[in-house]
A protein has these predicted regions:
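Catalytic cores and adjacent flexible loops of soluble metabolic enzymes
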Residues: 1-302
């Protein structure tokens, strides 16, 4: 190890939203089961829904029912993705604790994803942030394609940092860099994070090329302590060709446990939640820890 690691890390599981979004629709009652399983395992930040058009994203229909149906815990932050002011109004009315918004560092990706320019999306963030501020709710701005675009290749770290500054000026209270395309490497993580004036940034990592876990370790060495992950490693953007799922929550927690970085999350219960995801989507999830368990698990004696 080349640097002291943080004593603690915070994980936001985005599985109920980002993980299930590209799947065939899962019943609201089952999505509620998943959220409750995650908080039961110790997660204290969960992205539970997206308030988007159900015609455009059928898997996210019924977001308000999910938010109102979960077993709310006072010490858990329940977040929802919103694409615009109307989505923010619906999410706040449902009672979410945090709003997440996305703007891409790639102009081409932003056009394909939300049919707006980056400038237009920054303006939307300002509208959402103003509404959220009136309600006393924080807004996390997620910069997608922060480590590269499938249409434009690598994006200069200074450009990514400039967009982050604009989002903060627009009213975002937190910032997350997303490796939407799975193009990040430890080198790119260092370059992009170092370009910021502060390391108070979260990372949302995808495992398209099998580098998500090593990228998380590299980020820890840089002082990053906030991570977005998805139980079971599900997810992936339809606008990023060949994009893999998110870094599996249970795999990151298993690593952090071994490194002595506290999360407050029970990795065994989390592995069980990943198997619940398999039941809900009807296929095997791409997570080694979900199937083999953490490294300390012992085989049955018989």
């Amino acid at each position: 190890m080349t640097a002291a690691l943080p004593a603690r890390a915070t994980i936001r599981d985005v599985g109920p939203r980002d993980g299930l979004q590209p799947e065939e629709p899962v019943a609201v009652a089952d999505r509620i089961r998943l959220v409750d399983a995650l908080t039961g395992a110790g997660l204290r930040r969960v992205e539970v829904a997206a308030f988007v058009s159900p015609k455009a994203v059928p898997a996210m229909a019924g977001g308000a029912e999910v938010v109102t149906g979960i077993a709310r815990a006072a010490d858990v932050t329940y977040a929802a993705l919103v694409p615009n002011r109307r989505g923010a109004e619906m999410a706040l009315e449902a009672g979410v604790d945090e709003l997440t918004v996305t703007v891409s560092a790639s102009e081409a990706y932003n056009q394909r994803n939300v049919r707006m320019s980056t400038d237009e999306s920054v303006a939307v963030v300002g509208e959402v942030a103003a509404l959220a501020a009136d309600a006393g709710v924080p807004v996390d701005a997620v910069v997608s394609c922060a480590f590269g675009s499938p249409y434009e290749g690598e994006i200069a770290p200074a450009e990514v940092a400039a967009l982050a500054d604009r989002l903060a000026e627009a009213g975002a209270t937190a910032l997350t860099y997303a490796d939407t395309t799975g193009m990040a490497t430890p080198r790119r993580v260092a370059e992009v994070v170092d370009a910021l004036s502060t390391v108070d940034v979260g990372l949302h990592l995808h495992d398209t090329r099998g580098t998500a876990l090593v990228n998380a370790y590299a980020a820890l060495e840089l002082g990053v302590t906030r991570f977005d992950t998805a139980v079971g490693g599900l997810g992936g953007s339809p606008f990023a060709h060949g994009a893999g799922g998110n870094l599996a929550t249970e795999e990151l927690v298993a690593l952090l446990d071994d490194l002595g970085v506290h999360t407050g999350i029970d990795v065994e219960a989390l592995a069980d939640a990943a198997l619940l995801v398999e039941e809900l989507v009807g296929r095997e999830v791409p997570s080694g820890v979900a199937h083999a368990g953490p490294r300390h698990r012992r085989a049955p004696s018989d």
